[in-house]
């Protein structure tokens, strides 16, 4: 009996430890501590009266084909998420420039900044000019897709081709009935960000309930900044950029896009920022990317639609081989509208 009692005590002591949630890394304000796959450079400039720097990777191919691809990340992603695409594109002869936008990842986090897609597009164009990129394929994923569309509208002569990968902004959420949330309310929500909340959100909306251990790294990258010493600043930027996404639709200007365009759409994606604030019947209709992709392809003159059945919000992460093959095929296409 003594022996059994001892076993019970040991089991009781061990059980709580086993039940503890896994520890996840905390990163600095500029994603300090998270390694990128290539050397990170910084474009320093003044914007809205503030000195700041955009982090970026500029990867040269071994056998150049004379073309450049610019990669624009989403709100919950970074330039590093394109790790595989950088390699694939570089191997195919493309110069690849993967940018962390101001307010994100390894770039400056200005607290008193008027965030707009126009401003971010201007920053990006200035960066590209500084490294002598006059024209490029501009590929944007998620929020980066909205930015890429704005970039193509602002700088058509600098855009060889627009590629949007499950972009946000294929619908106007406020017009569809999603209530406005103040920056202060959004900040309160952003402060609650953890590995678990990010994973739960992505599992539901990005990956259609199918999780792979490989995704953990990207969740840790995003959530880790919310656990570090700069968490309040990171959360504030998150609130400002969420409001930017909600209040600055680009969908109404799709017919004005004049550059060759490819839409790459995972069909099971249901992403709709702010849907949790909307009435259930409204939320249920939002984020139908299978339908939204087709609608966008019709609205954009000469656009090509590439669909990924059974894939969600991040097909380049979820099905990289399938995605990369389709991307290289799209970049070899010709015969689309030409910018004036």
What are these regions (language model features)?
Residues 28-59:
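N-terminal cap/lid segment of alpha/beta-hydrolase-fold proteins
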Residues 41, 80, 101-117, 173:
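Glycine-rich "HGGG/HGxG" loop immediately N-terminal to the catalytic nucleophile
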Residues 43, 227-298:
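Conserved serine/cysteine hydrolase catalytic core
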Residues 48, 52, 57-106, 326:
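Conserved HGGG/HGGXW glycine-rich cap/lid loop of the alpha/beta-hydrolase fold
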Residues 118-136:
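Conserved acidic catalytic loop of the alpha/beta-hydrolase fold
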Residues 149, 153, 162-193:
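Flexible "cap/lid" loop of the alpha/beta hydrolase fold
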Residues 193-255:
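Conserved alpha/beta-hydrolase catalytic His-Asp/Glu region
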Residues 290-340:
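Catalytic active-site module of serine/aspartate enzymes centered on a nucleophile-bearing elbow/loop
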